Amino acid sequence: MRLFGKKPKPAKARLSLPRWMLARFDAAQTTKDNARHWSAAEFLSADAEADSNVRKILRTRARYEVQNNSYARGIVKTLADDTVGTGPRLQMLLEDEAKNRLVEHDFAEWAKRIRLAAKLRTIRMARCQDGEAFAVLAQNPRLSTNVTLDIQLIEADRVTDDEMNADGRSVDGITFDSFGNPVSYNVLKAHPGGTASFGTDSVTVKAENMIHVFRQDRPEQHRGIPEITSALPLFAHLRRFTLAVVSAAEAAADFAGVLYTDAPANGEADAVEAMDTIQLERNMLLTMPGGWKMSQVDPKQPVTTYGEFKHEILNEIARCLSMPYNIAAGNSSGYN
């Protein structure tokens, strides 16, 4: 029945979205509370994020921290010692035992002459604090062994691009083919920070003669960053907190005691010159001015939480290297 003489319009179908399409990730939301935290997050490629300038800053700071922080130095050195140990040993499994012993002896002699274990430890330390290590396979005529192959270590700062030779397939000194395989390395003749620098003079080393060691954290990443990068601010906090505790304890220890009085101002207490100092000697008998008392300063340092702070921050530092706390701290007293 038409009450107003018009045909009613058909109802429009309401679009019903699946429930999963209405979901959102909380971490993808930018609010006034988290905007500052995520302000440094950028959408860059692996090589752009770790370009030559960024890696130079990270290497410089990591080296500085390792040189001046005993915990950082110990962690890096322990990592290298535990990884390499006394060096690799060759075990031959041929049927001829005499040949096995001969080859094993020659390998051990060659490894000793080129200081293989020491160089491997240096490579592991460089990978941790510099992010990467380079080693050139070259013939050393001064070796007295039957095999004259030697390993020449190259610092990461020397493998870089000459501005005149940079192209699309070169990533800061490393040239790749269309499949991403390294073809050659551009190595400066001297360290750019050395006193005998040759400027941009460089040599080209073929990929088959170069060993490049680094940890690839992202696809299409071709250069390494220090493995302790995420821990560098924590190392700084550890040193600053330690210095603050020591400074507070020293400041409190500068005062053997303080004179005070309970008498009101202009009261019956003897007049004492403000900010006056008295030298105290051991086993001395001290008399106080009338109405005055002596009290020692409560230093409140070191704080009781100092040990807990060091434990937690060292544990956090060691996580970026997958190292247990007792190894990083060099202390297993709490494990027994």
What are the functions of these language-model segments?
Residues 1-31, 200-240:
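N-terminal start-of-domain structural block
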